[in-house]
Amino acid sequence: MRVRLAKEDVNSNYKVSLIDVSREKDFVKILEDYNIKYKRTEYFKDLFMYKLIDINSKFIMILQEKASNYIKYIEPVSIYSLPLQIEDEDGEIPVVYPEENKDYVTLGVIDNGIAHIKHLDPWIKRVHTRFLREETSTTHGTFVSGIALYGDKLENREIVKNEPFYLLDATVLSATTIEEDDLLKNIALAIEENHKRVKIWNLSLSVRLGIEEDTFSDFGVVLDHLQKTYGVLIFKSAGNGGNFMKQLPKGKL
């Protein structure tokens, strides 16, 4: 049983993976005996997680005593986030419009929404969201979509040399942060409902935890499963750290 505790051992939400699923009822009984609130999320067959709400090392010690032989690991739930601030720069570039009777690929933007500004509105083909518009800020998704469509023009040089494309706004979070289980369910729903028309997806959310040296994360496993199940490609950002602003060496992925 691998254990990783939250910083300063404050009460936090933890995720638990079982190595022996036949003991699931025993595990649930322990949770209920100690009045622990929990949420079970099944991503696909044979991959599910338990999220234990608001616990600390005291209850984790109980799990080590009573269930260490069938728990694979317990660790804080990963929290994915967006930049809190995006710098504005003055300038203007011409609006690009779709040509009539021309087919364009559609890019799925998995983010916090895309604002219907004049540069992007002609290209937004569809909006997939579980949130009310007033609940979303559309800051980061708009930023990402603008770079995707106008990147070469903003740089005033050819870097990507790509053709324009339609956008599918896949809004998967309403605030600036979201816990891993909720995020993955939202991503899965967006791809499940739109995979026939959208084969390329961009995912530029961040997580503050470093990668493991010898194992794949649950997040990566679920994304791979979605790619194989629905025949899509998901492009995930990595290494977007801030060390360069402090003139420090590159950090670990």
Model-derived regions, located:
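Autoinhibitory propeptides
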Residues: 1-97
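A short, charged/proline- and glycine-enriched loop
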Residues: 10-13, 100-107, 163-165
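Substrate-binding/access-modulating region of protease and related hydrolase catalytic domains
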Residues: 26, 173-253
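Acidic-leg catalytic submotif of subtilisin-like serine proteases
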Residues: 92-132, 147
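Flexible, small-residue-rich helix->loop connector segments that border functional cores
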Residues: 110-117, 145-163, 189-194
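Gly/Ser-rich catalytic serine loop of serine hydrolases
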Residues: 131-143
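Short helix-loop-beta-strand segments that form the rim/entrance of peptidase-like active sites
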Residues: 148, 154-176, 199-204
